[in-house]
Design a protein with these regions (language model features):
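N-terminal helix-turn-helix DNA-binding module of bacterial transcription factors
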Residues: 1-67
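Generic, well-ordered alpha-helical segments
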Residues: 36, 70-73, 95
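Charged, helix-prone or intrinsically disordered regulatory segments positioned adjacent to compact structured domains
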Residues: 67-76, 80
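Extracytoplasmic/periplasmic substrate-binding proteins
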Residues: 92
Length: 351
């Protein structure tokens, strides 16, 4: 505090007296409440800054505590939007099921209830918006979309606080909670090297290569610049025959002793070209839950679900609605899991 500056805390009521409006109006304007006009919100925020107003963090914490303890219906529900053509398919993936479980448990812990809404011919985005608005559901969670994207039309995102899981949800460009895929790639490579593997290859699909591949390539560079195996990208345009052909050619040319992949059917693909796991080649995956191998990364999916709920509740508490100008990404580090598809290499110390 500058010498001569008053030590008295500036309050909401002080700002209200200066502007000749009610303290309720000032409070709402400072919270970006859309019931207050943009011009007045801007004026209140400008004057409050000039007067040296700072929110009392203890009062804010008390307010959030009271809101969490209240049995009133306001803010009592959060929406989980399932857009999959076959709705049960979403949670058939163990990763995504744990997203739901973590989110559901965290919502209950915080005094909310998480409800699933399935989009279909009857539950259109327009109808969904009316239901959410009528029930005062202010928070939306968007789980992974798979291969399809939703045509949201004129959905009014500015009325809702929204968080998406991962990068398959392209629209809306809301805040994101997901696994730290670059870190997971590096964790995987380092642990494969720890187990004695020296010729570690990466096999991926185009949409996943950049995310997981960066950590893998950095790990490869750190380990030994003289051993470089280019990642094999199995493009969507390949038919089954082409996939097996390019896989076999890559294996013959680079002779990896272990493979890191995000393709769940990789073990079966290797078997079909005559490579047994783990006898001929070790195998690790980016998801030990859905990846088709028991060695690799546990993405801590339940924690991702919890974090998504914490983020959306924070947005509600701060009245931050709509598609943000600056998107925040909350990344959860995975952990390595040893497994039988990637046994320790005998005599690795000599390698």
């Amino acid at each position: 505090m500058n010498p001569g500056q008053s030590s008295k805390r500036v309050t909401v009521r002080d700002i209200a007296r200066r502007l000749k409006v009610s303290h309720t109006t000032v409070s709402r304007a400072l919270k970006e409440d859309r019931r207050i006009s943009p011009a007045l919100r801007s004026k209140v925020q400008r004057v409050s800054m000039a007067m040296g107003y700072r929110p009392d963090p203890m009062l804010a914490a008390l307010s959030h505590y009271r809101r969490g303890m209240s049995n009133a219906p306001i803010n009592a529900e959060l929406a989980w939007i399932n857009p999959w053509p076959q709705p049960k398919q979403l949670r058939s993936f163990k990763e995504f099921d744990l997203y739901w479980r973590g989110a559901y448990e965290e919502a209950e812990r915080c005094g909310f209830r998480l409800e699933e809404f399935v989009l279909d011919k009857e539950m259109t985005p327009a109808r969904l918006e009316k239901i959410l608005y009528a029930r005062n559901i202010q928070g939306i969670l968007l789980p992974p979309h798979g291969q399809s994207q939703i045509e949201w039309g004129d959905f009014h995102w500015e009325n809702f606080c929204t968080v998406r899981f991962g990068y398959t949800v392209h629209h809306p460009a809301a805040h994101v909670v997901t696994s730290s895929q670059l870190t997971d790639g590096l964790i995987a490579f380092e642990n494969m090297a720890r187990l004695g593997y020296r010729r570690i290859g990466l096999i991926s699909i185009p949409r996943m290569l950049t995310r997981f591949g960066a950590g893998y390539l950095f790990g490869q560079w750190q380990q030994n610049a003289s051993i470089t195996i280019p990642p094999l990208v199995l493009h969507d345009k390949y038919n089954d025959e082409e996939r097996f052909r390019v896989l076999k050619a890559w294996m013959n040319e680079y002779k990896p002793d272990a493979i890191l992949t995000d393709i769940s059917k990789m073990r079966e693909m290797l078997r079909k070209i005559g490579c047994k796991v783990p006898e001929d080649v070790g195998l690790a995956v980016f998801s030990v839950l859905d990846g088709g191998a028991d060695a690799g990364i546990d993405q801590r999916s339940k924690e991702i679900g919890r974090a998504a709920v914490q983020m959306v509740i924070s947005l509600i508490n701060h009245n931050e609605r709509g598609i943000p100008e600056i998107c925040r990404e909350l990344l959860i580090d995975g952990r390595w899991v040893d497994g039988g598809t990637l046994p320790e290499v005998r005599g690795k110390a000599e390698g």
